[in-house]
Amino acid sequence: MGDKIWLPFPVLLLAALPPVLLPGAAGFTPSLDSDFTFTLPAGQRECFYQPMPLKASLEIEYQVLDGAGLDIDFHLASPEGKTLVFEQRKSDGVHTVETEVGDYMFCFDNTFSTISEKVIFFELILDNMGEQAQEQEDWKKYITGTDMLDMKLEDILESINSIKSRLSKSGHIQTLLRAFEARDRNIQESNFDRVNFWSMVNLVVMVVVSAIQVYMLKSLFEDKRKSRT
């Protein structure tokens, strides 16, 4: 078992069970919102680790975009190893937890499937990570002496935070819509292939049945009596 490498939050690490981080595995760039799409082979399980501070909010949303049944097993565990969420054969889910200090683990399990691989999308939304409090402290040193202004820096800060929150929510909705669109497109393509296959089967059956019927009708009118000389 190799050594585990942990990066400062909110960088996310990819691992495969047995719980060993893949050598050279790339992490996410620091961001409060991160999304990732990956392919989980049949009979495999993939786990991710997310370091979190105290009293922050961790929201995980996942969807199965492609694969037979569009289902997966999901497991979320606390830094102490306590199971927080365990779902079986689900196509999507949303879970929010108030965090404590430590590394949260969440896994996607496809071991129940022996043939079909799954394409999985998930998104992390991290709130109350401490950056906002630090930003407010940075702004406070510019507030002194601004009472003469028509608009105080507190008002500007409030407007900026409101715009930031709405832009973040808009980006989150767009990401989810792209995931839904990808899953619907995969379902439509699968249905298209299935309809074409069975249409060809029906066509072949119809041709064979028609040929048999023609042969049987023709045989009814044939004179099989032998003429005497």
Swiss-Prot record:
Q: Name one GO biological process term.
A: Golgi ribbon formation
Query: Which UniProt keyword terms apply here?
Result: Endoplasmic reticulum, Golgi apparatus, Membrane, Protein transport, Signal, Transmembrane, Transmembrane helix, Transport
Q: Which residues lie on this side of the membrane: Cytoplasmic?
A: 218-229
Question: GOLD domain spans which residues?
Answer: 45-126
Give each disulfide bond as a residue pair: none
Q: Which SMART domains match?
A: EMP24_GP25L (SM01190)
Q: Which residues lie on this side of the membrane: Lumenal?
A: 28-196
Q: Where in the cell is it found?
A: Endoplasmic reticulum membrane; Golgi apparatus, cis-Golgi network membrane; Endoplasmic reticulum-Golgi intermediate compartment membrane
Write down a Pfam family by its short name: EMP24_GP25L
Membrane topology listed for this record: Single-pass type I membrane protein
Its signal peptide is 1-27
* Transmembrane domains' residue ranges: 197-217
Stated family? Belongs to the EMP24/GP25L family.
User: What function does the entry list?
Assistant: Potential role in vesicular protein trafficking, mainly in the early secretory pathway. Required for the maintenance of the Golgi apparatus; involved in protein exchange between Golgi stacks during assembly. Probably not required for COPI-vesicle-mediated retrograde transport.
Identify this protein by name.
Transmembrane emp24 domain-containing protein 5
- Say which species the protein is native to: Pongo abelii (Sumatran orangutan)
- Gene that this sequence comes from: TMED5
